[in-house]
UniProtKB/Swiss-Prot annotation:
It comes from Photobacterium profundum (strain SS9). Mn(2+) 2 binds at residues 41, 79, 114, 195. InterPro entries: Calcineurin-like_PHP_ApaH, LpxH-like, Metallo-depent_PP-like, UDP-diacylglucosamine_Hdrlase. SUPFAM superfamilies: Metallo-dependent phosphatases. This is UDP-2,3-diacylglucosamine hydrolase. Keywords: Cell inner membrane, Cell membrane, Hydrolase, Lipid A biosynthesis, Lipid biosynthesis, Lipid metabolism, Manganese, Membrane, Metal-binding. Pathway: Glycolipid biosynthesis; lipid IV(A) biosynthesis; lipid IV(A) from (3R)-3-hydroxytetradecanoyl-[acyl-carrier-protein] and UDP-N-acetyl-alpha-D-glucosamine: step 4/6.
Length: 245
């Protein structure tokens, strides 16, 4: 009995090393598990479900093969792929979950999320997030031709990279009080999220109880997987060279 969690792969046609490692993971490791959870930023950028490039087709095919084999796959959007919609889910067999979801992880209620909503000190990002999650603005964006949306997406991506370099480390990390507040609100003592690219297991206290916050790693330099069984969870890495083994 195994459940796997991944996040922050930032898949793109340019990073074939990440894509190859991911496809190997899907074809080998994810085949005989209870469930796969993808906690956001699966893609470097998502400009609409109508983008059907050869690169995206192979990613969707990998998920479809897995779900057709009987492995349920769940997705929570991140700050790079929040425009993923129903068409993508239909084509892959994945289930789109609310941005804050409590699951039963082998008897333990566990809050899963991407993690960007925990960074409440990053006021510039929160203002940006509020704008791009506006349904009317999203409708206007989808009215644009796909090629123009690609240009807009590239501009947003380059601007985001520049802004992040100018921000302090503390602003870009989660706000501890917000973590405790949300866990107390959801009545859980276990949380799993990504977004910060700082894999670790944090032992904290929520309402006088010992609690655990597990942070998933990104896939920039190697694969990062949280492997959970009824006996517990462990953060593991997957070397890009494993695809050749």
């Amino acid at each position: 009995m195994t459940t796997l969690f991944i996040a922050d792969l930032h898949l793109s046609a340019e990073r074939t090393d990440i894509t190859d490692c991911f496809l190997h993971f899907m074809q080998q490791e994810a085949r005989n598990i209870d469930a796969l959870y993808v906690l956001g930023d699966l893609f470097e950028m998502w400009i609409g479900d109508d983008d059907d490039s050869p690169f995206l087709q192979q990613i969707k095919h990998a998920f479809k093969q897995l779900t057709d084999s009987g492995v349920p796959c769940y997705f929570i959007y991140g700050n790079r792929d929040f425009l993923i919609g129903s068409r993508f889910c239909q084509e892959t067999g994945m289930t789109l979950l609310p941005e804050h979801t409590v699951i039963d992880l082998y008897g333990t209620p566990t809050l899963i999320l991407h993690g960007d909503t925990l960074c409440i000190e990053d006021e510039d990002y929160l203002r940006y997030r509020k704008r791009v999650h506006n349904r009317f603005i999203q409708w206007l964006f989808f009215c644009l031709p796909l090629t123009y949306r690609q240009k807009v997406g590239d501009k947003i991506r380059s601007g985001s990279s520049k802004n992040n370099k100018e921000k302090t480390t503390s602003i870009m990390d989660v706000t501890p009080n917000e973590v405790v507040r949300l866990m107390a609100e959801q009545n859980v003592i276990d949380m799993i999220h990504g977004h910060t690219h700082r894999p670790d297991v944090h032992h904290i206290e929520v309402n006088g109880k010992a609690a655990i916050r597990t942070v998933l790693g990104d896939w920039y330099h190697h694969g990062s997987v949280l492997v959970c069984t009824p006996d517990g969870c462990k953060l593991e890495t997957r070397d890009f060279s494993e695809k050749n083994q």
